[in-house]
């Protein structure tokens, strides 16, 4: 409903975020996009390795953006990736990330050096070998957090959702200041 309310005649795409690795309502979003003839570009910076019913969240929409920053569950220390379904769009992105060059003598548009350097690419290849172990370790930490926090008044959190393979990249908690006895910000500054 909020997405539909925000659509104007100038809208060309919906850009939802899989925040904290928690998948959006991808079917609902796609239904709205189809109704209005819009593209769907997902911000999947937090969602590497996340699946819904065995299907990667990267398979939904027209494009997904990934961050490979050092703070992510899978990283190359810096950089990222685009997952694009449309071959024509992929080709254009390939040109733009290579200074706009479409060949040795043809420049199609102003571009950037958007390629991952060799060191980060090698680091990423090595990290792919252990990303499943990293996710499994993060899952165990999330289980301990839940066991510890489940009975604390005023503290709530996301539970695992059946059919979703999480990456446990983050463990956000929600603070009810009245029940907990202090606000989220007060707790944050106390724990610093």
Give the label of every model feature segment.
Residues 1, 5, 13-17, 22, ...:
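PLP-dependent aminotransferase class I/II
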């Amino acid at each position: 409903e909020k997405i539909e309310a925000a659509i104007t005649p100038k809208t060309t795409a919906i850009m939802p975020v899989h925040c904290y690795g928690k998948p959006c309502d991808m079917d609902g979003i796609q239904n709205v996009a189809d109704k209005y003839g819009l593209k769907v570009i997902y911000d999947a910076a937090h969602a590497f390795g996340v699946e819904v019913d065995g299907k990667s969240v990267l398979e939904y929409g027209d494009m997904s953006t990934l961050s490979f920053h050092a703070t992510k569950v899978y990283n190359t220390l810096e950089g990222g990736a685009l997952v694009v379904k449309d071959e024509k769009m992929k080709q254009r992105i390939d040109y733009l990330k290579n200074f706009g060059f479409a060949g040795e003598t043809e420049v199609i548009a102003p571009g950037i050096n958007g390629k991952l350097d060799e060191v980060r690419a090698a680091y990423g290849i090595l990290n792919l070998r252990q990303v499943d172990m990293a996710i499994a370790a993060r899952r165990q930490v999330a289980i301990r957090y839940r066991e510890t926090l489940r009975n604390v008044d005023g503290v709530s959190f996301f539970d695992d959702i059946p059919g979703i393979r999480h990456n446990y990249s983050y463990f956000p908690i929600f603070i009810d200041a009245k029940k907990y006895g202090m606000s989220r910000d007060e707790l944050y500054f106390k724990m610093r």
